[in-house]
Amino acid sequence: MLFRSDRADAIVSHYYWIDSLKESGLALALTSPQEKPVAQFHAKDGVIYTVNASSAGKAEREGESTLWLRDNEDTLLASLTFSVARSNGQQVMVIGGLQGPRRSVTRDVIKLATRACHGLFPKRVLMEVLFQLAARSSVRAIFAVSDEGHVFRALRYRLSKGRHFHASYDEFWASLDGKKLSAFCWQLPLQMARKSLEEIASKKRAEYRRRFELLDEIEASVKSHF
């Protein structure tokens, strides 16, 4: 793995980062046993989506804090578990888990959510929240576990975690312009570059404009905690 420090050091680093956050509500959410809202935004037709945060709980092998995306009916669409560690004297985010919905949630629900978010997949929405958290704190790099490196890769864990869809991490990180550093780890960009509207086909510009407005709303919602 990328980081050789023991688990105790990793935990200390994460809570040092949380202590550095100026807004107590955000710090409380990231350490709470129960989900607490950290961002909201309006999707298509004015529907409000919420990103909650909590301590990692049962996902503690994947990280220390978890982000959760829920729709206006409180359906869980995606979750992301991460920690903040130290590498070469700098604070870095490490994504240890990224899950879709429980199996009781149909793929049609995810398609509708993606359409409501103007083409942004639920996992991509959570990544935007993470990018904003990194940008507004002292994080200097973002790393992510690969398919090979995930703690639940073993068959017995996949069977025990069968309530969730398991999509390929490697494919998703590649879609974010990530770079594979080893069999176990990817490095992701600190921000996703946006195309200018001039680069986009005219028939798609209105949809992209709405997508950018949604991303701006997510940014403003996270920024309100800093």
Label every model-predicted segment.
Residues S175-F226:
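Charge-rich, low-complexity intrinsically disordered segments
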